[in-house]
Amino acid sequence: MVTIRADEISNIIRERIEQYNREVKIVNTGTVLQVGDGIARIHGLDEVMAGELVEFEEGTIGIALNLESNNVGVVLMGDGLMIQEGSSVKATGRIAQIPVSEAYLGRVINALAKPIDGRGEISASESRLIESPAPGIISRRSVYEPLQTGLIAIDSMIPIGRGQRELIIGDRQTGKTAVATDTILNQQGQNVICVYVAIGQKASSVAQVVTTFQERGAMEYTIVVAETADSPATLQYLAPYTGAALAEYFMYRKRHTLIIYDDPSKQAQAYRQMSLLLRRPPGREAYPGDVFYLHSRLLERAAKSSSSLGEGSMTALPIVETQSGDVSAYIPTNVISITDGQIFLSADLFNAGIRPAINVGISVSRVGSAAQIKAMKQVAGKSKLELAQFAELEAFAQFSSDLDKATQNQLARGQRLRELLKQSQAAPLTVEEQIMTIYTGTNGYLDSLEIGQVRKFLAELRNYLKTNKPQFQEIISSTKTFTEEAETLLKETIQEQMERFLLQEQA
């Protein structure tokens, strides 16, 4: 028989009393009523906040979006395959936030800021809310510095400034992503941090973009946020806000950032899916009533900071895909009304071999020449008008056989202007090269050449100017104006190169 020793028992009781902790921990919990299609209905969670993160028993995280009288609608940030009916859920008391740091540069991450490039964890000492309020009126200043895209058609006629929001819109396969990626490539050496957000894209397309950046050395200053087409709708909905939070981190550190959303219409579709499954009432095209707010609160975060905040900037280029050129659909009209202008890419121009296929007539930048250096204003001021007149004249000339000499000359000039706007992909031009190209076209130096010779002549002229007249580039970059000296140098170079070119062609 086991003897009971009173002293041992009293020691154990004494130890337990000493270890007793009077701290009371209140956890807001609930029970899963129903789960499926990335949505869970929870009973309980009485004091949960809208947008608060909740944690399921098996570790999945969700966001409480619908707070109803008898249950809470939660969207899952994962597949949630192990969640069972009746399992417990606890509120975390936190709103979605991500870690941020310089270490994110050169990495590919998902909407939760977790690396997906297989290169290990990313160290970060601070975090930022995924949804931060946009800067107010006082903390902004008007856009005045250019953000060079390296594309003549944009920088000369639809200029983009630092802190602007410019929509890139067009049908599928018209080169929208190419315009955006070329803009990122052109930021090399410009001290601009770039964030590329891929929402609902094919994984192969994202891999292709990342490979291009790596080959051209652009990943050094770029962060790629990717949620591919097979990701849960919740993560596709969050990805743009994650990208914006990362760009804001640099903007508030007095840096310049460029963020590309490719594309917000996929985000709207993911949000529509979530909203319909949460049984929110559908509106136009079955989108929920707050789909405008979805995009406006995202794009309003792009800004040019005031001098008191360090004059950092965040430039946003959302890309929206249209169906057979229909710009009047719901999402395109929403985004057009939020942004400061749009670059319209046309399938007809693309198929006609005009690439980038920018329709200059209906593209617009509401910031205008404020986002150009003086030299570009001087040279490119009339080119948009000339091209618009040429397009009108060309349409009219199709019905008329006998045209007078002046009209024929105007048509010839317009065709050459259109030719000089063509550019190969991933071949951005410096602002000095653009000024030289436009000046050559608008002043009639190309009129004597055949249309097929224009691009070859311009490429040779750029090389000749760089090697023989480097002072031209120095004048433009130092004074930012197209001085008489620069014009004289350029005229001499064009004449010398024209003689050399014509001799080569005759030989």
Curated annotation (Swiss-Prot):
The record marks S363 as: Required for activity. Its EC number is 7.1.2.2. One of its GO terms (molecular function) is proton-transporting ATP synthase activity, rotational mechanism. It catalyses: ATP + H2O + 4 H(+)(in) = ADP + phosphate + 5 H(+)(out). It comes from the Eukaryota. It is found in: Plastid, Chloroplast thylakoid membrane. GO terms for cellular component: chloroplast thylakoid membrane; proton-transporting ATP synthase complex. Transmembrane segments: none annotated. Pfam families: ATP-synt_ab, ATP-synt_ab_C, ATP-synt_ab_N. Its main location: plastid. The keyword Transcription does not apply. It is a peripheral membrane protein. Keywords: ATP synthesis, ATP-binding, CF(1), Chloroplast, Hydrogen ion transport, Ion transport, Membrane, Nucleotide-binding, Plastid, Thylakoid, Translocase, Transport. GO terms for biological process: proton motive force-driven ATP synthesis. Gene3D superfamilies: 2.40.30.20, ATP synthase alpha/beta chain, C-terminal domain, P-loop containing nucleotide triphosphate hydrolases. ATP binds at G170, D171, R172, Q173, T174, G175, K176, T177. Produces ATP from ADP in the presence of a proton gradient across the membrane. The alpha chain is a regulatory subunit. F-type ATPases have 2 components, CF(1) - the catalytic core - and CF(0) - the membrane proton channel. CF(1) has five subunits: alpha(3), beta(3), gamma(1), delta(1), epsilon(1). CF(0) has four main subunits: a, b, b' and c. Belongs to the ATPase alpha/beta chains family. HAMAP family: ATP_synth_alpha_bact. This is ATP synthase subunit alpha, chloroplastic. It comes from Vitis vinifera (Grape).
